[in-house]
Regions:
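Peripheral, non-catalytic segments flanking oxidoreductase cores
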Residues: 1-169
């Protein structure tokens, strides 16, 4: 899901990609409300993180806020299906990549699998922690900070079990 915009919004009327209303299932009845509330909470968390980046850079705390007035941020509910490790020993749940936005905020289930690449080039697992978020710097923040905050290279390892996560990109 993404920012819910009405059909009469100027960006929707102009036909801008990724702008408009979301498509929602009818059931379960509280699904939409729950996801919309979670999405808004994650947007606020992302805004606070961006304020911290700005303050760390010696800028006004609102420096990055106006760049998120109509965010293209997407909340994705991800499922990485179980793979037969004997047949697919090197198969990744998601290959190495960086995210495009300013900051990605995610939770992962107890299975784990998220790995980040250190500056030295080693892959290290991010252990799941109940009630905690993982925040990865995105590519646009790397550009905005002239590389001071590099985008986080990460991947999802296959542990041979179903894995679930929720990510705001």
């Amino acid at each position: 899901m993404a920012l819910e915009l009405p059909l009469d919004d100027p960006d929707v009327k102009a036909g801008k990609p990724f702008h408009g209303p979301n498509v929602w299932p009818r059931n379960p009845p509280q699904f939409r409300k729950t996801l919309e509330e979670y999405y808004q909470a994650l947007l606020l968390l992302g805004e606070q993180i961006c304020r911290c980046f700005a303050l760390d850079l010696g800028l006004d705390e609102n420096y990055f806020v106006d760049k998120h007035s109509k965010p293209l941020a997407q909340l994705r509910l991800l499922h990485y299906p179980e793979l037969d490790m004997s047949r697919h020993p090197d198969q990744q749940g998601a290959g190495a990549h960086t995210d495009y936005g300013s900051v990605a905020i995610l939770t992962q289930d107890s299975i784990g699998g998220l790995e980040i690449k250190t500056r030295e080039g080693q892959w290290i697992p991010i252990e799941p922690t109940d009630g905690a978020f993982v925040c990865n710097v995105g590519h646009i923040m790397e550009i905005w900070t002239n590389g001071l905050y590099p985008a986080t290279w990460h991947r999802v390892a296959n542990h041979g079990r179903d894995r679930y996560s929720q990510v705001l990109f």
